[in-house]
């Protein structure tokens, strides 16, 4: 059975962590918005509920930025990341701006330490590193499965709201 009080307390903690009054160094939602300011989000969650949260977060990021966002299994994201062209160290973004933003892998970690999730995470992180794609992770590993789910979901939703503000869009 889900303990509604515990879930509500988890939501309160996320609201405190992601408060506009929190410095960016201590605010995972603001950090997420900065990571995605000029990036295309590729969102991954390893467990069933983290994967569900990743789809919801991707929807929020897509709505906030007007850009494509993808939530998928690690193997599918690795295929996308493997096709990312290498960075040109000598490219001048002001002279030759690229038409598409580089991707950033967003990992929603609910503390699931099964072998399959660990393998998928390592595969995704290694592929991203090999192709110079940034990886950003948020973790909510304490509490019940539902508490971890809402922690990941709402950190992503706060991040999407900050991204929307940073990009100059109204919060309608």
Predicted segments — roles?
Residues 1-16, 20-172:
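A SIS-like phosphosugar-recognition module
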């Amino acid at each position: 059975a889900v303990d509604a009080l515990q879930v509500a307390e988890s939501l309160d903690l996320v609201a405190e962590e992601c408060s506009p009054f929190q410095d960016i160094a201590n605010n995972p939602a603001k950090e997420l918005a900065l990571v995605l300011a000029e990036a295309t989000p590729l969102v991954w969650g390893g467990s069933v509920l983290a994967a569900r949260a990743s789809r919801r977060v991707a929807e929020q990021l897509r709505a906030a930025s007007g850009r494509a966002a993808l939530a998928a299994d690690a193997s599918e994201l690795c295929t996308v990341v493997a096709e990312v062209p290498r960075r040109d160290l000598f490219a001048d973004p002001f002279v030759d701006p690229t038409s598409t933003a580089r991707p950033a892998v967003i990992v929603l970690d609910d503390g699931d330490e099964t072998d399959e999730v660990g393998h998928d995470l390592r595969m995704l992180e290694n592929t991203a590193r090999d192709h110079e794609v940034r990886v950003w992770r948020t973790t909510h590993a304490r509490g019940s499965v539902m508490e971890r789910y809402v922690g990941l979901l709402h950190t992503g939703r706060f991040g999407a709201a900050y991204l929307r503000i940073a990009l100059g869009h109204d919060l309608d």
